[in-house]
Amino acid sequence: PGFILIDKVNQMNNNWFCEDIRATNPCGEQPLPPYGSCLLGSVNLTKFVDYPFTDKASFNYEKYRKVVGIFTRMLDNVVEINGLPLAEQRHEITYKRRHGMGILGLGSTLAMLRMPYGSDESVQFTEDVVREMAVEGWRQSLALAEEKGPAPIMEDEFEITPKMMNKCPDLAKDGYKVGDILKGKLLHAKYSRYMQQIGHV
């Protein structure tokens, strides 16, 4: 059993301007809107430990970044051959090009690096690994947008509603009002609370 802080999830949703997250799968890694779909995959961290269980043990970040980059492209390609059963699901995934990448083997990797689980060193390592995945994923996503074009949602125009103004007070601060029209890419990149954090990474 578990619970979801659905208001917080919606607050941090990149696509806050065009969807409401309703639920998540039992493990909680991918909250989705109605008919939403997200292709998931994980990178096995144990494969990047050099000299495991020794004093020379280290994590090969160069190899890790390369695999994350390739995997980002692979997941994006799977969007196009998704095989989803419902037309609404197929529209959702091709319109937003959503995919999700995570990690597995963290505990084993920490043991291979001789880091006690829960130590300050292990917490910092975990933050570093996740940050590197996010940054490399964003880097590849930008390259993919240049090669394939952006996801259709980015080029669509959205009319600002009272609900959007309430969710994002920054719109009013920037001089926008109800009825104004903005591109999805602006609403996504500038006004998503999650995307605003990229500058701090």
Model region roles, listed by residue range:
Residues 1-3, 7-93, 105-109:
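Function-dense linear segments that define catalytic or interfacial modules
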Residues 61-62, 100, 126-127:
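Short secondary-structure boundary micro-motifs
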Residues 67-90, 94, 116-201:
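Internal maturation/activation junctions in enzymes
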Residues 41, 100-105, 149-150:
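Glycine-centered flexibility motif
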Residues 97-116:
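Extended amphipathic alpha-helical segments enriched in small hydrophobics
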Residues 16-19, 98, 132, 168:
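Eukaryote-specific, cytoplasm-facing alpha-helical/coiled-coil scaffolding segments in long proteins
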